[in-house]
Amino acid sequence: MKKIRIKLKSFDSGILHRSTKEIVMAAKRNGALVSGPIPLPTRVSRYTVNKSPHVDKKSREQFQLAVHKCLLELSSFNAHLLSTFTNFQLPAGVDISVEVRDE
């Protein structure tokens, strides 16, 4: 049995949530069994930089970048669903990777 594993990444959790809802609704309309969305751990990168280039070592600024991730698994799908995902329009800022697996 083949399964489709869809991983979504975004810097904005709201956009990621709306995109997963759209994908789940499209999959259910085409008769696929959906397991998920499964939230994956958020990767947070923190950066500390000096405010001044010369003196005042104690004066620093901190930035952070959070990457939110989510996983969907679809089973019992048809070829029409695959063509739907290739033409699917996601908002800017959402990265999608689609993987077809044999299980």
Curated annotation (Swiss-Prot):
The disulfides recorded in the entry are none
Q: Does the entry feature the keyword Ribonucleoprotein, yes or no?
A: yes
Q: Which UniProt keywords apply?
A: Ribonucleoprotein, Ribosomal protein
What the entry lists under Pfam families is as follows: Ribosomal_S10
Q: What does this protein do?
A: Involved in the binding of tRNA to the ribosomes.
Q: What is this protein called?
A: Small ribosomal subunit protein uS10
Provide one Gene Ontology cellular component: ribonucleoprotein complex
Recorded source organism is: Neorickettsia sennetsu (strain ATCC VR-367 / Miyayama)
